[in-house]
UniProtKB/Swiss-Prot annotation:
Gene: yvzF
Domain of life from the UniProt record: Bacteria
Organism of derivation: Bacillus subtilis (strain 168)
Cross-referenced Pfam families: DUF3970
InterPro entries according to UniProt: DUF3970 (IPR025088)
Protein name as catalogued: Uncharacterized protein YvzF
Length: 61
């Protein structure tokens, strides 16, 4: 399992999450951190925390 913090524009974050889903199981996605924390209320970037697990490789016989 890996924990990752992403920061950037919302569209960029969504694209990254979709690309992660090709090779990883995204088990947790937090709310946008920039919107819920008053310290970052006026920041243009948002932050999201993810938990990732490797997808198990399926062996075909």
């Amino acid at each position: 399992m890996a924990q990752v913090r992403l920061a950037g524009k919302q569209e960029e974050i969504e694209q990254l999450i979709r690309s992660f889903e090709q090779h990883y199981d995204v088990s947790y996605t937090s709310k946008e951190y920039g919107r819920t924390n008053p310290k970052y209320k006026y920041s243009k970037d948002s932050r999201v925390y993810l938990e990732l697990k490797l997808k198990s490789a399926k062996i075909e016989k």
